[in-house]
């Protein structure tokens, strides 16, 4: 019975997160920073190249040093081209992975199923995360949780 409840929590977290954020697959590039990060950045649009990788580790184009973000965007463009829909979905999947990881870690640390599920659901669905899920260039918070 307990295993069924845990699987049910994972399922509900997955379905609710996808239900809320699935619409981003139809979003376009944002007018704020996406041009610097993707749509007008030839290093990113070229995909993963040696020059691009070197650039990712040596640039502070936007005032930040975040090579993992650049490499991730390059990989996205390598796989999907300059199409924002799949890149948005990658952000959703990263957010979902973070949500499930949070639930697993909290459950392991506390042994409490329902409080862990509640915190993970609040993390997954809180409006504060809309920006970091729906905006292409905000991969930093998605990757930061893994460390």
Predicted regions and their residues:
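Polytopic membrane enzymes that build or remodel cell-surface glycoconjugates and lipids
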Residues: 1-147
